[in-house]
Each structure stands twice: as structure tokens, then as C-alpha cells.
Amino acid sequence: MKKLKVVHYINNFFAGVGGEEKANIPPEMREGAVGPGMALAAALGDEAEVVATVICGDSYYGENMDSARKEILEMIKDAQPDAFVAGPAFNAGRYGVACGSIAKAVEEDLGIPSVTGMYVENPGVDMYRKDIQIIETGNSAADLRNSMPKLAKLVMKKAKGELVGPPEVEGYHMMGIRTNFFHEKRGSERAIDMLVNKLNGEKFETEYPMPVFDRVPPNPAVKDMSKVKVAIVTSGGIVPHDNPDRIESSSATRYGIYDITGMDSMSADDFTSIHGGYDRAFVVKDPNLVVPLDVMRDLEREGVIGELANYFVSTTGTGTSVGNAKGFGESFSKKLIEDGVGAVILTSTUGTCTRCGATMVKEIERAGIPVVHLATVVPISLTIGANRIVPAIGIPHPLGDPALDAKGDKKLRRELVMRGLKALQTEVDEQTVFEG
């Protein structure tokens, strides 16, 4: 029997190409299995083989989603596979978005059975769970030996046209799809059994789980920005050099509040980035790329804003749990209110950093303060529920372009901040992306 052909998608990290400094590499295709593709090949056994591996940098895909997806689809189409596997991405946000986006497109546009895998808190799960089967994984690559056989088993079922079972059987995240089938007990009996178990305090499982929506209505627009105190919050990991609060480089459990009284710019002598989710080279040289103090001071002097808070709030968003991010936002929002802050600009960098940032945005909004989210990976911000969003420039430099000279870079940063201020002064009744 002829072996089925499988194409595998991985990012630059898993391909062994490099770390964050190589996260901007464009798509390429290699023959055979690469990196975790070896585990996929082993799990497929004698029925299928990995004929090619597509590799792309996470930042490149995140910043060029439409064109990168189109290029990758052409590569996959040329390989003529019978099935496609992306990842697994575990809890890597940018990687998860890429895996979900590509797997969805391969199945819908090319008609090739596809699967991917992610940790439950990966933002890619909520973005693509209704479109594609996403195998539940652990939060790191340590789970590869457990998750890859599940991906292989499911994609082979799909490739051979076999019936795919429910999430609890196959191990994928719930898709919100209901299927009719014959049960050995009629509905009334099952309902009575469920009620009896509930009354007795015993375990029971609903047959119709209700979706949970956590959306916060947008606050009214700022009427007169020239009379309002504005604060800067970031999930981009900017801290003083000694990192006094010992904020972790990933999966943060705390945040910090740092004084900027009398400062006209974020100096590399005073601040650095401890963030583990993007290439910090640009930001270490110029922290204004994440915390736009230089531009905000100019706007304060010009009377565009009433006042800039004499501190900024910072944490590391990469890998940080939704629960922790929510707790951070609830906590520091109380201080913002006590200090009379009337508007917030929140900046984010990578994928899970954007998830963390958008989660904090919702808590700031819930506290009654208008807030705008400046982030490059806009789809994640939308999925999590930010209401006012301004697309940023790039994952490792959201508020500027290091390729420009200092004057041009600052001009670009000012344009972004002004767009953010415009968003804060615009009435919205639904999620709105302010493109410019």
C-alpha cells in the first residue's frame, strides 16, 4: 500500500534556525522531516511519511500574515500532500496564530485534511477552534512525546476519511459543533440521571456546555484630552536595569510601577527589557520603542494631553497566564483611578504578550478608564476583546522603525501615539481597529 504524504509546518525555533534574532525569516520549504517532524514521522508509522517541512519565522508571519499565508499555501500545494500538520505550538502565541491560520487555509482553500496542536491558553485556540481541530497539548515542548501521537492519529483519520470522534475522545479543543447520533438512553432518562447526580453532589457532565463570553463594553470617549492625565502601561517587559521587582522574563507572576518624574525620554542607561518573547536588541538600545516617553513628554508640553502620569506600569506578557494578567489589570487599575488617570495607552509586543496586554486592557476598561491597545498582532487583541486597537509597526519594535534615522523614527512614533489619542477621543460601540 502506498504511503500517504504529509507536509509539516514549524517555526524557526523548532527548525533549529535560531532564536528571536531569526524570527523574521521568510517561508522556506525543506525536503523530509525537520526537528519535531522526526517525532511526527515516528508517530505516523508505516502508513504515511513526512515528505516536506515548511519553515517560517514567527515574527515574519505575524507581521505579514496575508502574504506569508499565500506563499506557504503555494509551497504546500506544490508538494501535493494527502494531509497537513502544523506545530504543535504549545503556549507560543505567535506560533499558535500561524499554525491555526495556515491549517485553516490548507483545509479550506486546498481541501487537504489538516490538524494542529496548542495549549489551552494559546490565543490561537480561541481564534481558530471553530475552524480546525486543535489537539490539546501541555504548555511547553516537554509535552511533545504525548501530543505528537495524538496529532498523527487524528490527521490520519481525516486523511483516510474515517469518522472523527468528539473532543473528549480524540483530544482536541471543543469546537462548538453539535452532531446528532443515536444514544442508548433517551433524553428524558439522561436528564433525570444528571439531576440525581447533581442533587447528590456527584460528578455530572452537561450535554450542552454554554459558551463563556468575557467582553467589556467600551468606555465613553475622552472629551478633551488636553485636560486629562494619561498613563502608559506595557506588557513589553521594560524595567530598570536592576529589575527591582524581579519580574520573570516569561510567565510573569508580578508587575512593576516605575518612576519617570523629570525624564524626557526612556534612556538605555536607566531602562532595559527583560522580555523573553521577542528580539530585544532594538529596545535595549531605545526603550522608547515600547514605552513612548519621548513623544508623550512633547505632547504634554504642547498641551495636547493634560498631564502624563509620573510612572509607567510594566510586566512581561510572554507566556503569562490569562489569570495573572487579569489580576495585574485589576490591581494597578485601582492605583490609576486613585491618581486621577483618565486615559491609558497600553503597548504589547509578541503573541502571548498581546494576549496579556489585551487582557489587562479589558480590566482597565472594566475599571472605567478609556484605554487603547497598540499592538502588532491585531487578530489576538481582537480575539481577547480589546475595544480600541491601533496596529503597531513590528513585534520587536512596536512604536518605531530602527531602520529610520532618529528623527524619522520619532516622527513615526508620534504618528502612532497620536492615532492612539484619536482612538481614545472617538466614540465606539464595538471593537474598532484604527488603521490610520
From Swiss-Prot:
It holds the Pfam family GRDB. It comes from Peptoclostridium acidaminophilum (Eubacterium acidaminophilum). One of its GO terms (molecular function) is glycine reductase activity. In the first step of sarcosine reductase, the substrate is bound to component PB via a Schiff base intermediate. Then the PB-activated substrate is nucleophilically attacked by the selenol anion of component PA to transform it to a carboxymethylated selenoether and the respective amine. By action of component PC, acetyl phosphate is formed, leaving component PA in its oxidized state. Finally component PA becomes reduced by the thioredoxin system to start a new catalytic cycle of reductive deamination. Belongs to the GrdB/GrdF/GrdH family. It catalyses: acetyl phosphate + methylamine + [thioredoxin]-disulfide + H2O = sarcosine + [thioredoxin]-dithiol + phosphate + H(+). The active site is at U350. GO terms for cellular component: glycine reductase complex. Its EC number is 1.21.4.3. Heterotetramer of two alpha and two beta subunits. Component of the sarcosine reductase complex, together with components A and C. PB is substrate specific. The keyword Oxidoreductase applies. It comes from the Bacteria. This is Sarcosine reductase complex component B subunit beta. NCBIfam families: gly_red_sel_B, sarcosine_GrdF, various_sel_PB. The gene is grdF. It is an enzyme of class 1 (oxidoreductase). Keywords: Oxidoreductase, Selenocysteine.
